[in-house]
Amino acid sequence: MFNEINQDYYTVEEIASLPFYTEGPAADAEGNIFFTNLSGGSILKMGSGNKITEWASCDYPNGQIILQNGDHLVCDVKLKAVRRFDHKGRFIKNEIEKYCSGKEFTSPNDLVTDKEGNLYFTDSVRDKGKICYLSASGEQSIFLEGLDYPNGIIFSHDERWLYVAESYKNRILKIEMERRNVAAVSVFAELPSHPSGKKENNLPDGLAIDEDGNIWVAHYGSQAIHKLSPQGLLLLSIDVKMPLTSNLCFVNSHTIIVTGGYGEPGPGGVYKIYLK
């Protein structure tokens, strides 16, 4: 949808076509790729030869991360919970459910942990969206609220900054951290606008960070992912061929997995981008 920048820098390949819209991409140490299918109620695993199997059952899984011990944390929108599965896909427990520090959350969407194992996750609602915090020892707090549909969330490598997509503002926020609290909030980047001008075509979704500290954004409705410099400058836009681009993750420094689809609840797809 956008004029692509540096088209000789990458290739785009569809590696899966599926009945349901996909989300929550994550890669393990062996190179296996995991993703969720929301309405399909499954966490899926793609192994060698791009073979896809159901790895775990989950009511309405969205964002997903893999921890160092191999456990998966998954946002379940229907249950209003962040759920933990072991490395074999066996459900362990709900880490947090329905309430955070006494306040209800209704749409857990995406999540990230810091190096100490503290969890931050977005509650994606219009105008009153928030970021919830759950410490490794079980303490809860509302980290930030009053956001217009907070979505993808990622730390800088030194964890001085927390980035969050504010979907209905079509922008990425940059939060300065101070002892796990908010020191300051600023606009990191305003994203390109879809030619239609419709809000639903201008929704930044999942985020990822590369080894150089560049922030990558899945731009839902715009059929694109964008690469932003550590200063928030647009460096690259890629047409993913899939209008509802939901999320992305790095398998290695040259390979990106992108989830999303052509409608909700489906059909969905998974794409692989090779950076040259």
Regions found by a protein language model. Give the residues of each.
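A short loop-to-beta-strand structural motif that recurs across blades of beta-propeller domains
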Residues: 42-44, 81-83, 129-132, 171-173, ...
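Blade/loop signatures of beta-propeller domains
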Residues: 1-10, 30-31, 40, 123
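Short loop/turn segments immediately following the C-termini of beta-strands
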Residues: 38, 77, 118, 124-126, ...
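Short loop/turn segments immediately following beta-strands, especially the blade-tip
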Residues: 175-181, 273-276
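A short beta-strand motif characteristic of beta-propeller blades
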Residues: 11-16, 50-56, 92-102, 139-145, ...
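Beta-propeller domains
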Residues: 34-53
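Beta-rich, blade/repeat-based domains predominating
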Residues: 16-30, 57-76, 80-81, 100-119, ...
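Short, conserved beta-strand edge motifs with alternating hydrophobic and charged residues
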Residues: 122, 154, 163-166, 172-175, ...
